[in-house]
Amino acid sequence: AFLWDTGVLVSRVEDVLCNGGRNILMLNVSFACHMPDCLEMPYKPAIIGMHDPIGKEVRWYMGGNSCLAGDYVGCWSFDERHWPKPGDLVVFRDMIHYTMVKTTMFNGVTHPSIVIYHPEEDRFEVIRRFGYEDYKHRMG
């Protein structure tokens, strides 16, 4: 990539669980489908409101929504004492440089929409929304 900090990937918490002593946020995005660079190389994106754990802070792993067993990345801690709940947003920084060019629709997982934020008007403009037809056309 020749540009950094070019865009964010906004995800939503679908479920909060603890498995084998690990706190996991199940998200509506997939590392395997939307952020493959996080699995293929040692790239750990920054998350707004979170940081690398220090000492005995509560650690959170992020789980993706595909059926791939390894569709998770971790771990982070919240900047403030916070116990997340379904519906909360998790915003990954600096994700657009690979998110849009290396994505897959593995098992029909939808691509994230492309949206531009216009801060002077405090509004979002949807440039492209992906759906089933996009998946179907990729299958041939």
Q: What do these predicted ranges mean?
A:
Residues 1-140:
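Charged (often Lys/Glu-rich) extended helix/loop segments that serve as interaction or gating elements
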